[in-house]
Amino acid sequence: MAKILVIGGGAMGSAFTVPCIDNNNKVTITEPYSKNFIRDLTSKKKFHSSLKLNLSKKLKFKKFSGDLLKEKFDLIVIALSLSGIDFIGKALKTSKVKTPLLVLTKGLKHEKKTNKIFTISEQLKKNYNLMNISVLKGPCLAKELARKNQTSVIIANRNIKIAKWIGKSISTKYYLIDFSTDVIGVEVCS
């Protein structure tokens, strides 16, 4: 059983909690800026307005803060939109987080100064000196995952043992996972 923090209460972050909880992990979710998702996640029934379903009663919600990031977690999942990557990168760097990170966010970032394109994992390493970053990508829709429809993803980390540990912690009969050491390739192809 792992202690997992999911940062981002949108559709994918919230849907991702379903297989995590089904795999007997202790899951906490936080939402840095959307009042709608905070309302959804703190309601008694935990009805998620985007997913159109009630999330597990086992799911804990905690207010986002630097202190929350300093708590002991086995895995921190980043499920923010691309525009939230700089925000969370700064927060994780400030909190001196050493916990393994799993990035669900899709997209590439164009750096105007150098006219280069970076993947999210490259950006987090380069700009915020964050290490031990895994990425999870695949043809997985949030609503399908939340409804436990069978879907598949790939977890990539240069250290395949970490990718496999994460996979073992979150895989279910409906959430099938493959692994790769090609982090950039998996990110670019998502």
Mark where each language-model region is.
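NAD(P)+-binding Rossmann beta1-loop-alpha1 motif at the extreme N-terminus of oxidoreductases
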Residues: 1-55, 59-63, 70, 111, ...
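Hydrophobic anchor at the start of a short beta-strand
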Residues: 4, 25-27, 99, 131-133, ...
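General small-molecule cofactor/ligand-binding pocket signal
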Residues: 28, 60-62, 134-136, 178-180
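Glycine-rich beta-alpha junction loops
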Residues: 33-34, 108, 137-141, 159, ...
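Rossmann-like NAD(P)(H) cofactor-binding subdomain of soluble oxidoreductases
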Residues: 55, 62-148, 166-167
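Internal alpha-helical scaffold of NAD(P)-dependent oxidoreductase catalytic cores
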Residues: 95, 126-133, 150-190
